[in-house]
């Protein structure tokens, strides 16, 4: 609908294995922010712009061979975020788990993770939190927010988990 926005799907994105194959650079939404819980809004506010910039940078990088370290890091983070956002058919993820995974990706906790291990990282991280700190999931789910105290706890958990995962 013209009043709510449009989602544009891209065959190149689809053919590269990314599902859903949404082109964030040209898709428009007026309701997206209103449909999100506060925790998601606070952590993913710049995600759409970051992904659009990543797509442009990735296209540019195909033509150049000498990329500086900052550009390489942006490309790596972008690829990780794309991997994080992939979704298997009939496999929805609860919002509290989405918040944790997107938070981890946007804040660099997966930067040292190889691209083919991102899914394993996600699975093991969510299991680790469910066993050791499930209260974070409950708080996000029940309040819809990622309070400062819980964000601090989440950072600590992520720091611990990354050390064991990358060991």
Question: Across the structure, where does each feature detected by a protein language model lie?
Answer:
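Conserved catalytic/coupling modules of large nucleotide/cofactor-utilizing molecular machines
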Residues: 1-167
């Amino acid at each position: 609908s013209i009043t709510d926005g449009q989602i544009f799907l891209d065959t190149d994105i689809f053919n590269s294995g990314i599902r859903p194959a949404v082109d964030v650079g040209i898709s428009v939404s007026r309701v997206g922010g209103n449909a999100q819980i506060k925790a998601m809004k606070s952590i993913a506010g710049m995600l759409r712009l970051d992904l659009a910039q990543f797509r442009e940078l990735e296209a540019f990088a195909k033509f150049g061979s000498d990329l500086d370290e900052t550009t390489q890091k942006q490309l790596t983070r972008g690829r990780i975020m794309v991997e994080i956002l992939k979704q298997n058919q009939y496999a929805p993820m609860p919002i509290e788990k989405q918040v944790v995974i997107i938070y981890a990706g946007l804040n660099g906790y997966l930067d040292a993770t190889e691209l083919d291990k991102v899914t394993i990282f996600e699975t093991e991280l969510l299991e680790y939190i469910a066993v050791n700190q499930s209260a974070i999931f409950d708080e996000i789910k029940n309040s819809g927010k990622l309070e400062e105290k819980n964000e601090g706890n989440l950072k600590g958990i992520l720091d611990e988990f990354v050390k064991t995962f990358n060991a």
